[in-house]
Amino acid sequence: MVKICCIGAGYVGGPTMAVMALKCPEIEVVVVDISEPRINAWNSDRLPIYEPGLEDVVKQCRGKNLFFSTDVEKHVFESDIVFVSVNTPTKTQGLGAGKAADLTYWESAARMIADVSKSSKIVVEKSTVPVRTAEAIEKILTHNSKGIEFQILSNPEFLAEGTAIKDLYNPDRVLIGGRDTAAGQKAIKALRDVYAHWVPVEQIICTNLWSAELSKLAANAFLAQRISSVNAMSALCEATGADVTQVAHAVGTDTRIGPKFLNASVGFGGSCFQKDILNLIYICECNGLPEAANYWKQVVKVNDYQKIRFANRVVSSMFNTVSGKKIAILGFAFKKDTGDTRETPAIDVCNRLVADKAKLSIYDPQVLEEQIRRDLSMARFDWDHPVPLQQIKAEGISEQVNVVSDAYEATKDAHGLCVLTEWDEFKSLDFKKIFDNMQKPAFVFDGRNVVDAVKLREIGFIVYSIGKPLDSWLKDMPAVA
């Protein structure tokens, strides 16, 4: 019986291995992690991450051919294929700080694999890593191998949180990169045979190691680029009276462009986009390609601009001051159908409003209060490091931030409300009830274009929607730069 072990029980490792176990009942799959609370959660009825469909998959396989354990060395020792899905956060200090990927956890995992292994293994990069990381990992394994043969493969994930299980069931493609040697090709075939249990062979793409590693960074950079492009267009639409939704539809019907990732918003977030673009920028700079680096820098700059522009619009619309005013924040996760708050635009918007002395009342259906408070108190880039290493700001935010359990409580007596996550439930709220319980004039700032602005204006709201023609009230406010 083939045994697969995955080091790292996070957003990638857990769901990926759960689906692999479901589709390959004859293969034993073990997910290991040094975090005992996380493993205990995977073995409980309350999983550590929220993902539609994940709970059903885990329940079908757990205890049969899917296991979760803190005994990392034991299961690595017993496995034939080892997936490494540990964090590769952005470095916070030293060479490349703020851009380069921190491979500390990856190197530690590689050294442990070499130390405990007594038989040949296929080691699979599942984490997103800089191009040519496999070469460094190969050297670590080879120099510590004690004669054992290791084959390194790159098998990047292309999951979207909120649809991860669907993406795993029906992937656009599976990408496997390996060495162009007999042993390397044999390793590629072994992993391809695993995926072929449910993925059509023609959708399994095999490349060299470096192409696979760079393809993941490129895919995320291209997606983020589209978001920044439409967000830059949203600013121009507001200035000219055009409607970004109509512009995006007209552009997206061009078959060369397509409609996906053309929804204007308050900005992109999540664990990958910004981190991977910063990594790509650093790689370009290290390879003497400043023009290429500057191109990708602009994608991040536009994203930051969009968040600042939104927060400034809130302040300027409300008589240029939000000091002491209650503002409801609807949605804190970086997108709907996930509890993930990593790099969510809500953090920057909330912190900017707090800096202007606003009082925030925050509601998100999946994000816990502890997480929200930690995010608003944390130094940048620390979110992807272990909790003991996270630096929390000395100044507290408790007096200005209140986390509540429903949207109606959040909006009661508020001067304005900001929609920062596109949760479906926000579309069906009783906005007449909300309006009646808010201070007047009552403002809605829709950062996701999910509410019906026409109906809200009929109720009496002053509405700002990203990239849409401005209310006459908003046109009279100071320009937002």
From Swiss-Prot:
NAD(+) binds at residues 8-13, 33, 38, 86-90, 127-128, 161, 272-275, 342. Disruption phenotype: No visible phenotype. One of its GO terms (molecular function) is NAD binding. It catalyses: UDP-alpha-D-glucose + 2 NAD(+) + H2O = UDP-alpha-D-glucuronate + 2 NADH + 3 H(+). Disulfide bonds: none annotated. It is an enzyme of class 1 (oxidoreductase). Keywords: NAD, Oxidoreductase. The active site is at 272 (nucleophile). Pathway: Nucleotide-sugar biosynthesis; UDP-alpha-D-glucuronate biosynthesis; UDP-alpha-D-glucuronate from UDP-alpha-D-glucose: step 1/1. The keyword NAD applies. Pfam families: UDPG_MGDP_dh (PF00984), UDPG_MGDP_dh_C (PF03720), UDPG_MGDP_dh_N (PF03721). One of its GO terms (biological process) is UDP-glucuronate biosynthetic process. Inhibited by UDP-xylose. The keyword Oxidoreductase applies. SUPFAM superfamilies: 6-phosphogluconate dehydrogenase C-terminal domain-like, NAD(P)-binding Rossmann-fold domains, UDP-glucose/GDP-mannose dehydrogenase C-terminal domain. Its EC number is 1.1.1.22. Substrate binds at residues 157-161, 216-223, 256-269, 334-335, 448. Induction: Specifically induced by H.schachtii (cyst nematodes) in nematode-induced syncytia. NCBIfam families: NDP-sugDHase (TIGR03026). Involved in the biosynthesis of UDP-glucuronic acid (UDP-GlcA), providing nucleotide sugars for cell-wall polymers. Belongs to the UDP-glucose/GDP-mannose dehydrogenase family. This is UDP-glucose 6-dehydrogenase 1. The gene is UGD1.
